[in-house]
């Protein structure tokens, strides 16, 4: 994501459409079915929502907006539907290695692992496990953000 000086209004709006408007439209389309089945919604945010990563102003802002929208949805869809958020930190995926190259990905992993209290970054399965738990096992949990970031959100100065 470009920094503030290189971020056009069009790019800012595109990122918001993807990360906020898209999930809103999905919830609106599925709300009746979710209510009748006592369903659950898990939106995927990012630790960037609370850390405000400097090189991704629109991304961080859109993920914070997604979390706030999820809190509002948790109130308005209760008691029939639970709404929660999973907020991953840096997560090892094939995309990260392809985008940064093997050496770049290893450097990012080393940097994040040295800061996070658990001294490791997440795997995709860690994020998936949190989502499955919120859908299937967390029957009395709504309006929450579950950080899957090794503690990065408590270790990084804001």
Label for each model-derived stretch:
Residues 32, 74-79:
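Alpha-helical segment proximal to the catalytic Tyr-Lys
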Residues 46:
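Residue(s) in the substrate-gating loop at a strand-loop-helix junction
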């Amino acid at each position: 994501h470009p920094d503030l000086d290189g971020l056009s209004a069009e790019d800012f709006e595109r990122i918001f459409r993807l990360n906020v408007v898209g999930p809103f439209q999905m919830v609106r389309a599925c709300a009746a079915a979710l209510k009748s089945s006592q369903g659950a919604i898990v939106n995927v945010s990012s630790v960037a929502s609370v850390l405000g990563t400097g090189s991704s102003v629109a991304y961080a802002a859109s993920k914070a907006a997604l979390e706030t929208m999820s809190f509002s949805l948790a109130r308005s869809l209760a008691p029939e539907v639970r709404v929660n958020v999973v907020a991953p930190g840096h997560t090892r995926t094939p995309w990260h290695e392809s985008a940064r190259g093997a050496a770049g990905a290893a450097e990012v992993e080393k940097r994040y692992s040295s800061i996070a209290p658990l001294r490791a970054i997440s795997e995709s399965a860690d994020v998936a496990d949190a989502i499955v738990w919120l859908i299937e096992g967390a029957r009395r949990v709504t309006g929450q953000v579950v950080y899957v970031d090794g503690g990065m959100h408590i270790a990084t100065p804001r």
